[in-house]
Structure formats: structure tokens, C-alpha cells
């Protein structure tokens, strides 16, 4: 079994595993690495098939979580952004003893719109899958542009995301397709009710992929969890609002 790319840095007494989103890699954390590594031992990860973790095909959510867990510290705070939030949540469900706290960023337990549940229309996700086979570079760029729409620094934020993608080899089409399949089909709304560890959910008010309407719905469904919405952020609050984002993590660290 191949190992995935994994880098550890920082000297905090609390371990923090950072999982990126679809189409990306650990370079997305560059804007907050320095700040966080003063307070946490950071674990920067390229998910299987993404960035420097080459040699993997498409995976299910369960397989992806299993791979990441294999190289993880015994106990850590797990933070996942977007698709990474589903992977971190899956780890918390299968190995709660390894998860000191769970943090999901601009993530949803069910990305796809369902009956009485706001999300991405399934035909949009299917459209992305279709376009991937035709022009996957352009499809990834369109998806990145969607993530920063509406913020005051949208252009700059989109450039930051794009440079993270271009810094490393592009994932295989099958891997990208597999990631979209997870976003299209995963539904962890019920299972996550059972979590007992501290659980912090961070959102961007302007997010076009995870509608803000899900926040009060999940506040009600998971009363033990906490939520925070960054008023002027979209899908990548750690890029548009790095200071406030790091403060939220420091506040969580004080509680665990």
C-alpha cells in the first residue's frame, strides 16, 4: 500500500491534521501555516491521488479516511476543508478515540441538494463530472472560481487557490471524478449525531457551494456542536480571513 505525502512541522503540544478540498493539495494552507505552527504540531497532508500523493485511483470516502488514518498521530485535532471535511468526519466516526476535536471548514455532511436540504444541485455536480473528461484543467479552474465568488478579495483569493493547484502535478481525471462522486453521494447527517468529541463547524456567509441555510439546520440537529460564520468569507475563509480563522482554532484549543 502506497504512503501518502505527509509533512509535520511546528512545536505545539497539540497535533492538528489539515485535510484539503477537491482538486487541491496541502499548499492551500500556506497562508496560515506559520501562524498555526507556533501553537500546534501541524500535519500537512495531500489526500490520496492529489498533489504529491500520486499512484492512487478513485476511492470511496471510507477508503480515503483509512489511508489518511494510517499515517496519523495517535490523537489529534482533525480539520477538514470542503471534501476534506467529509474525510475528517469519517475518521471521527470510525475512530473517535483518535480524534481530540473535529473541525469542518466550508463543509457539509451532505453536499448534494436533497428534499428539504439545501446544497449543490445534483445536475451541477454531474455536469462537472461530464466536463472533466472534456477539459479537466478548465473544469478545475471553474470550480476554484466558484469558491471565492462574492468576497472583497475574490480575484486574489482565486489566484491563491490556482497557484496551489499549479504548484504540483494535476490529479488524474479518475481521482477528480471519484472526489466529485463522494460530494454527490455522501450523507453523514444522521451518523454525525453520535459524535461526542468537541465539534466546531466554520462557514463563509457568501459560500456558493455550502449554503448558509445549513448552519441553523445543523445547529438544531447537532446541538453539541458549535458553529461560526465568517460574514464576508465564501468557500475558503482561511484564505480571505486568515487572522479570524486562526483565532477560532486557538479558542478551540483552549477548550480541549
Curated annotation (Swiss-Prot):
Pathway: Cofactor biosynthesis; biotin biosynthesis. The keyword Mitochondrion does not apply. Pfam families: Abhydrolase_1. InterPro entries: AB_hydrolase_1, AB_hydrolase_fold, BioH, Carboxylesterase_BioH. GO terms for molecular function: pimelyl-[acyl-carrier protein] methyl ester esterase activity. Keywords: Biotin biosynthesis, Cytoplasm, Hydrolase, Serine esterase. It is an enzyme of class 3 (hydrolase). The active site is at residues 82, 207, 235. Its EC number is 3.1.1.85. Signal peptide: none annotated. One of its GO terms (cellular component) is cytoplasm. It is found in: Cytoplasm. Coiled coil: none annotated. Its main location: cytoplasm. It catalyses: 6-carboxyhexanoyl-[ACP] methyl ester + H2O = 6-carboxyhexanoyl-[ACP] + methanol + H(+). Residues 15-242 form the AB hydrolase-1 domain. The keyword Hydrolase applies. GO terms for biological process: biotin biosynthetic process. Substrate binds at residues 22, 82-83, 143-147, 235. The physiological role of BioH is to remove the methyl group introduced by BioC when the pimeloyl moiety is complete. It allows to synthesize pimeloyl-ACP via the fatty acid synthetic pathway through the hydrolysis of the ester bonds of pimeloyl-ACP esters. Monomer. Belongs to the AB hydrolase superfamily. Carboxylesterase BioH family. This is Pimeloyl-[acyl-carrier protein] methyl ester esterase. The lineage of its organism: Bacteria, Pseudomonadati, Pseudomonadota, Gammaproteobacteria, Enterobacterales. The gene is bioH.
